Amino acid sequence: MAKKGTSAVWLRGFFGLFPAALLLAPATAQAPALSMLDHLQRGEWELRFRDGTPTRKICLRTGRELIQLRHPQSGCSQYIVEDTRNLVKVQYTCPGSGYGLTSIREETSSLVQVQSAGLAGSRAFDFTAEARRVGDCR
């Protein structure tokens, strides 16, 4: 009987202190999703495709414009596959238009490597490009 009482007191003490211990434990701050893209310099960027496709310029306002280069419309759902200090990988689906998987690796705040593959309309795409800031948006 003494053991039952001791266990009950111990359990009450443990569960009484457990929530307090959680409050005192150091909290790990969560970085905002895709925060690497927030570090990229805003402005006009030039995309140089490795397959010889003509260069293309885009105005980078948030960095997220690089995710859906073949699907620039809104209304697409996105799923973050990987999100690290200098690499993001996002899978996206655009109902009625297709889908893609894009990987963006930061070399500097004005230079990134982009790899994307998927389906745009009824056509498959797969490209690798270097994106570099070239000035202010026009």
Q: Which residues make up each language-model segment?
A:
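Edge beta-strand at a domain terminus
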Residues: G121-R138
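Short beta-strand segments that buttress and anchor functional surface loops
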Residues: W45-R48, V88-P95, I104, V114-L119
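N-terminal helix-cap/turn-to-beta initiation motif at the start of protein domains
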Residues: A31-R42, E82, G135-R138
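Tryptophan-anchored aromatic micro-motifs
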Residues: H39-T55
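Bacterial N-terminal signal peptides
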Residues: R12-A25
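Central antiparallel beta-sheet cores of small beta-barrel/beta-sandwich binding domains
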Residues: T53-S109
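N-terminal secretory signal peptides that target proteins for export/translocation
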Residues: M1-W10
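Hydrophobic/aromatic beta-strand elements that line small-molecule binding cavities or substrate pockets
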Residues: G100-E107, Q115-S116, T128-R133
